Structures are given as structure tokens and as C-alpha cells.
């Protein structure tokens, strides 16, 4: 039966939400009511499937799935007032921590002046951010297109590569197995997981997938394309596959891919949406091999965990295809003043506090600890790997991974699996995580594994 629109009901919902936004704390009864409300609304109006996938943080009926506010730079607080060390980092958005005061202040100051731009006049922060990224990024990267997410930055990169290479008779893209580049139609064509791809087949033509980290497979794809006249326009890959399970390629792989691109006249697109902004111990992961891409995709942490923003940065030679008609690819909210303010403040924090170097140091501490635990619990843990503050613990099967996430939640540490690899638990905390909290995370992981081992032995 169709229901009639209700302005009164919508107005009541808005008033209720605005009241919640104003509050800093909730009474016990308010907390219980809000939890019931949120779960019900997700079931009836968002997507009931999300509730099943949050099972690792709902054990024991503690309503932990409903978060309330940031606790500190490195923690979250739920509606019960329980504080959790954040080792998930919003899948890589909180590199400078939660509500970093420098970023929040910049956004608040810009909000007091002008939240969004007119679309017609030139906006200064977009210009300054583009100049900043040209200075910060490696090689000849010079021009920036701004958007709102990683998927959008990948879409822009693919369109830019097409516009550049189509007149040269090159139309095919090489992506890699295990890749995740987003879920919009173009980005999904480069993404490798069948679960995400099959419901939307056929995807865009002209994408080949080769084994990640295998330079011989990459060379063969280039050679076959040359022989058949189906030449390669561009290679798109992640320096480290995040959603694929934090998969690191062999040392020198990116360098060899760059050489192949140069040899065959293809563009190199690096998707650093997750690995960029200091996450792996360098500002950009490609800097570990001094590789310079033709197009670089950024998002997630670029907005400092305060505003959504993505960027597609390219060399002048490539970007010049948009010079004659800059309206070939645009977006209403891309590069808006609030987002640019957040990005500029984020870069300032990363550089002034030398957070990439901190990520390397703290990441080494955590990874050493996780590898020791892997040696102690071989029946549960298959591997521990990573670079900087992008790490993964791979368990023997999916269910063991879920159990670890649930046990860590009981220890007040938030972790989760990766999208392409459910048995792999990602460890991706803010780069601001203190040494003391690193030690607490390792202690919690040890406690979680010990509890899991006892459970296995009892069975």
C-alpha cells in the first residue's frame, strides 16, 4: 500500500536530529532509545544488510554499533560513553586523527566566511590547494581536478587518460587482480572483485586484469596488445592493495611498471586514495621507489577526517586535453571552500608534525608486535604484514577474522576486515596514535588471541 508524504513527520525527524546534534551527552534512557531508533531506521530506510555486516561490533547486545562522537585524536566514543582505540581509521580517512583542532579550526573559520563558492567566480582556496599539491607531489604532476571521493578521483583519472590516449589510437586499460578502485561504473571496471562486478555486468569495455606484483604478466599484456593492435592506454594500480588485504608487491615492481609504460607509451595512474597522505611512512607510497606517475588519485585522508575531498593530479601534458574546454569534466561540490580549507590544514599538520616519519616508526613497532603474535598463535594467524601504519593480520579463515574483530571490540579496540578479503583484518589507525596506545593495542591483540585459543582448545 502506498503511503502519503508527511511533512509533519519529516519536520519531526529534522527537529529530533537537530536536538541530538546539540547534545554532548545522553541519559541512559535516551541512549537506549537512540540505539533502537538507529537500528530500526537502518533496517527500514538505509539498508538492512549493513546490520549483518556489523556483527563483530554488536556482540553481547551492548549497542556498540552506534557511535556518538570522537573521544580524542585517536579514539571514538559510543552512545554508552565507552571509549575505543580507533585502529580502523574510517578505512584511512583519519590520518591526522579525529577532529584535529587545526583542521576543525580552518573549516570553522572558512564556514564563518563562505561555505560554498558561487561556481562562477574564481575561488582562492582551490587555487592555493592546487599549487600546494603541485609542490607536494612527485615528478611533473602539476594540475589538479577536485572532487568528493576516491571513486570520483579514479573516474576523473580514467576519463583524463581516455581523452589523452584516444587520439593516439590507444583505448585499453590494464588493472590488477585484487584491485579496488571504487564502485561507480568506470572505477568498478578496474576493480577486480567479482562480488561487486557481477550484478552490474557488462561493465565498461577495454579493461584487462593481470596478476598484481607479477611484472612478467604485465609485460605480456603490453606485448600482446602491441601485436594485436589493441594498444594499452594506461595502467591503473595501487602501490599497496588496501581492500585486497594489504598486499605489498615485490620491491621494484612499481619501477618496472613505470619502465613498461614509458616503453609502450602508456600512462601510469597510481591510486593512492588509501596509501597517500603519509599512511605508509612517506607522503605518497610511490616515493618508496621514487616512481613518478602521470596521474595520481587522492581522497580519504586528504580532508583530514573532517570534510570529504578527492583530487586527481596530472602532468601538464596529460591535463592539457581539458584546457580548451574545462567543462568536459566537472562536479558541483568539487574543490569547495570548506573541503579545500580542510585539505590545506591537513597537509599543514602532516608536514609540521612530520607524521609520515611517525607512521614509519610506529608502524614498525606495531608490525613487529603483530608478527610476534603470529608466531605465537600459528593455528589462528596465517600472516602479519604492512608498511607504515597500513597493516593487516591474516587469519586462517573468515570466521576466525570475525572472531578477532569481535574480541578486539570487547577489548575496546576497533578493527575490521577488508572489502576484498574477509579473513584479513586491517590495522589502519590515525598516524597520531601514541606509543602508549600502540602498546595497548598489542596487549589487547594478545588478550584477544589468547581468548580465541582457549575457545578453540575447549572445542
UniProtKB/Swiss-Prot annotation:
Domain of life from the UniProt record: Bacteria
GO annotation terms (biological process): L-lysine catabolic process; putrescine catabolic process
Molecular function per GO: diamine transaminase activity; identical protein binding; putrescine--2-oxoglutarate transaminase activity; pyridoxal phosphate binding
Keywords, comma-separated and alphabetical: Aminotransferase, Pyridoxal phosphate, Transferase
Catalytic activity: an alkane-alpha,omega-diamine + 2-oxoglutarate = an omega-aminoaldehyde + L-glutamate; putrescine + 2-oxoglutarate = 1-pyrroline + L-glutamate + H2O; cadaverine + 2-oxoglutarate = 5-aminopentanal + L-glutamate
Pathway named in the protein's UniProt entry: Amine and polyamine degradation; putrescine degradation; 4-aminobutanal from putrescine (transaminase route): step 1/1
Binding annotation for pyridoxal 5'-phosphate: 150-151, 274, 332
Pfam family, one: Aminotran_3
CDD domains cross-referenced by the UniProt entry: OAT_like
Gene3D superfamilies: Aspartate Aminotransferase, domain 1, Type I PLP-dependent aspartate aminotransferase-like (Major domain)
Residues modified as N6-(pyridoxal phosphate)lysine: 300
InterPro entries, per the entry: Aminotrans_3, Aminotrans_3_PPA_site, Class-III_PLP-dep_AT, Putrescine_aminotransferase, PyrdxlP-dep_Trfase, PyrdxlP-dep_Trfase_major, PyrdxlP-dep_Trfase_small
Names of required cofactors: pyridoxal 5'-phosphate
Enzyme Commission code(s) on record: 2.6.1.82, 2.6.1.29
Record family assignment: Belongs to the class-III pyridoxal-phosphate-dependent aminotransferase family. Putrescine aminotransferase subfamily.
Function per UniProt: Catalyzes the aminotransferase reaction from putrescine to 2-oxoglutarate, leading to glutamate and 4-aminobutanal, which spontaneously cyclizes to form 1-pyrroline. This is the first step in one of two pathways for putrescine degradation, where putrescine is converted into 4-aminobutanoate (gamma-aminobutyrate or GABA) via 4-aminobutanal. Also functions as a cadaverine transaminase in a a L-lysine degradation pathway to succinate that proceeds via cadaverine, glutarate and L-2-hydroxyglutarate.
Stored HAMAP family: Putres_aminotrans_3 (MF_01276)
Protein name from the UniProt record: Putrescine aminotransferase
Naturally occurring in which organism (per UniProt): Salmonella arizonae (strain ATCC BAA-731 / CDC346-86 / RSK2980)
